[in-house]
A protein has these predicted regions:
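N-terminal "arm"/small-domain region of PLP-dependent enzymes with the aminotransferase-like
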Residues: 1-31, 39, 127
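Short, conserved charged micro-motifs
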Residues: 14-15, 284-291, 320-323
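Conserved PLP-binding catalytic core of the aspartate aminotransferase-like
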Residues: 253, 261-295, 311
Length: 338
């Protein structure tokens, strides 16, 4: 049972299966992803804020978008600022270009939040081409409020940087603020993951929202047919199921509250998380992962994030979380007996 991934716990929308079956496998997919991008525009636009198709870039998962960003913005010995610990592919994509990477570490002894004022000083003095922040963050679940992102955007504007906000887990924030307001600013890009929102991990699908100029620059470097036909059709179908994310969110909130309470009852430290995963401070993450794996449960050892005392647990259906809680109780009891 895989708790190491963090995707919607209720499976893909039912209509996705029919959409996939309708795809002609002998035909090339639309290289422009027009139907999908139009569906994204309909989904995110409101009467007061219309998003044009020219401001939407579809990608083979959001990870492709980060690799496009680094190729375009960091190719000439550029600099990137990463707010860490965070998703490792940001660093990986930057390193492929030979860029200088600046890291602003969160307070790992406290609430896992970043010193945003320190971040703005780095941006204004170092003038990095890219500033990347995951919001809510992976693996800590920290969610920056509107004012904090605003400070970063203000600094990016002064420095001539592009602020990239990865919102892969935004759909599972209980009370989010409207980040689409940021699209009024040319120095900001939002990146979202349909893979996680709609449990379509095998298909790989994400999208970015930015100014027409930024989207056009990235599109020049994106291979044709990057997003396959199955993913395009599945994405259109998923967005049409307007009640899906409400059902997924309710499932996440219920199971997350249960699991957090159960693990705290075991004496484990479980920091507040605004995402569809939680951290648990277990002492020796590698050991706990191994012991849980022996019981058929897979969790994420956070050593690679620089957090060797923590495991990350993705939220699955409540029944699965009940089984994990029981398994972790057995591991905790065995640890006390040693």
């Amino acid at each position: 049972m895989d708790f190491s991934a963090s995707i919607s716990p209720i499976g893909p929308p039912e209509g996705v299966w029919e959409a996939i079956r309708s795809v002609d496998l002998s035909a090339y997919p639309d290289p422009e992803c027009l139907e999908l991008r139009e569906a994204i525009c309909r989904y995110i636009s409101t009467p007061s804020r219309q998003i044009s198709i020219e401001r939407v870039l579809a990608g083979n998962g959001s990870t492709e978008i980060f690799h496009l960003l680094t190729r375009v913005y960091l190719a000439n010995q550029g600099t990137a600022l990463l707010l860490t610990p965070t998703y490792g592919e940001y660093d990986g994509a930057c390193r492929l270009t030979g860029a200088e990477i600046l890291n602003l570490e969160a307070d790992l002894t406290g609430d896992f939040r970043w010193d945003i004022r320190a971040a703005t000083r780095i941006i204004e003095t170092k003038k990095p081409e890219l500033v990347i922040v995951c919001n809510p963050n992976n693996p800590t679940g920290v969610y920056l409020v509107r004012q904090e992102i605003g400070y970063l955007a203000d600094a990016a504007k002064v420095a001539g940087s592009l602020l990239v906000v990865d919102e892969a887990y935004l759909s599972f924030v209980e009370d989010p603020w409207n980040s689409l307001e940021l699209l009024d600013r040319s120095e900001v890009m939002l990146v979202r993951s349909m893979t996680k929102d709609y449990a379509q991990t095998a298909l790989r699908l994400g999208y970015a929202l930015a100014s027409e100029e930024v989207v056009s620059r990235l599109r020049e470097y994106q291979p044709d047919w990057s997003v396959n036909g199955l993913a395009q059709k599945a994405g259109v179908s998923a967005l049409a199921d307007t009640g899906y994310l409400h059902r997924a969110r309710e499932a996440v909130f219920s199971a997350k509250n249960f699991l957090s309470d159960e693990l705290r009852a075991l004496g484990l430290e479980v920091p507040r998380s605004e995402a569809n995963f939680i951290l648990a401070k277990v002492g020796d993450a590698a050991k706990w992962r191994s012991l849980l794996l022996a019981k058929g449960m897979v969790v994420r050892d956070c050593t690679s994030f620089g957090m060797p005392e923590y495991i990350r647990v993705g939220i699955r259906p409540l029944a699965d979380c009940q089984l994990l809680a029981a398994a972790m109780a057995e591991v905790a009891q065995a640890a006390l007996a040693e």
